[in-house]
Amino acid sequence: MRQTKTGILLANLGTPDAPTPEAVKRYLKQFLSDRRVVDTSRLLWWPLLRGVILPLRSPRVAKLYASVWMEGGSPLMVYSRQQQQALAQRLPETPVALGMSYGSPSLESAVDELLAEHVDHIVVLPLYPQFSCSTVGAVWDELARILARKRSIPGISFIRDYADNQDYINALANSVRASFAKHGEPDLLLLSYHGIPQRYADEGDDYPQRCRTTTRELASALGMAPEKVMMTFQSRFGREPWLMPYTDETLKMLGEKGVGYIQVMCPGFAADCLETLEEIAEQNREVFLGAGGKKYEYIPALNATPEHIEMMANLVAAYR
């Protein structure tokens, strides 16, 4: 009996190819055209997206990307490539491909890369620790579209999320401990997750529950009292209500109430990106300090640290 050859597909959101208005516009158009991300009526959404949002937001967002751009590309791309390469070194007999829901490299190119290696089983690991229809669901949809065009379909193992995986929780906890040791223990540890519209949760997306699970498990691993750990949601977009409490409003409130020192971690981001390095590490620092806070530290994402790569290897091992 022929032995199954397994490949691993690491999936993440994506990034513009360059910090320019043109590249950002292409990326945002693809991202914001996905019904998993914005499910507004197309008759209403297309004119707003093409006539208002893309022309106005693209130049502004391009400047933000330029402020965090690295020699090898956007932070998300640099760290994602490092993750892919490190996992491939950790699992030398297993092909590892990287694909993005939006932009390059595409999920389709990643699938084709693995099929060219003659794999007959693919383990798909969306690098979103907490499931949401707008992220993991988008990977699932695109994968289904890709495979619908293939004459032969490999076996697929799809990892829904890993919000309470103990290797993941331990890696987060060790990162927090290292930050506390380096910068001193704060008055409060704030865990900021990417938000989604409240309506999505009301309609069945269990993302907020998965975020609460990670928060509870991490606080337990750290042995921290509940009042010393707070969960918030960032990056809201548009006018409808998103998951609350909002990160920026919470930081402003805490600064005004006299909380002096906060450390912030974003457990939902497997790799640092615009939303962590610019929005959290810079914009929200200014919000907190401007409201009266005294000290603010951002705890980096796990990125391609050895402990994170070992977690990935252990996670996919159960499906190989």
Swiss-Prot record:
| UniProt record similarity statement | Belongs to the ferrochelatase family.
What are the GO MF terms of this UniProt record?
A: ferrochelatase activity; metal ion binding
Annotated Gene Ontology cellular component terms: cytoplasm
Give the enzyme's main class according to its UniProt record, as a single word: lyase
Protein name in the entry: Ferrochelatase
The answer, when asked if Iron is one of the entry's keywords, is yes
Which residues of the sequence carry a binding annotation for Fe cation? 194, 275
Q: Where in the cell is it found?
A: Cytoplasm
The record ties this protein, via HAMAP family, to:
Ferrochelatase
What is the catalytic activity of this protein? heme b + 2 H(+) = protoporphyrin IX + Fe(2+)
Principal location class: cytoplasm
Keywords, A to Z, come to: Cytoplasm, Heme biosynthesis, Iron, Lyase, Metal-binding, Porphyrin biosynthesis
**EC code:** 4.98.1.1
Q: A biological process (GO) annotation for this entry?
A: heme biosynthetic process
Which ranges does the record mark as transmembrane?
none
Subunit details for this protein?
Monomer.
Q: What does this protein do?
A: Catalyzes the ferrous insertion into protoporphyrin IX.
Pathway annotation: Porphyrin-containing compound metabolism; protoheme biosynthesis; protoheme from protoporphyrin-IX: step 1/1
InterPro entries tied to this protein: Ferrochelatase, Ferrochelatase_AS, Ferrochelatase_C, Ferrochelatase_N
User: PROSITE patterns from the entry?
Assistant: FERROCHELATASE
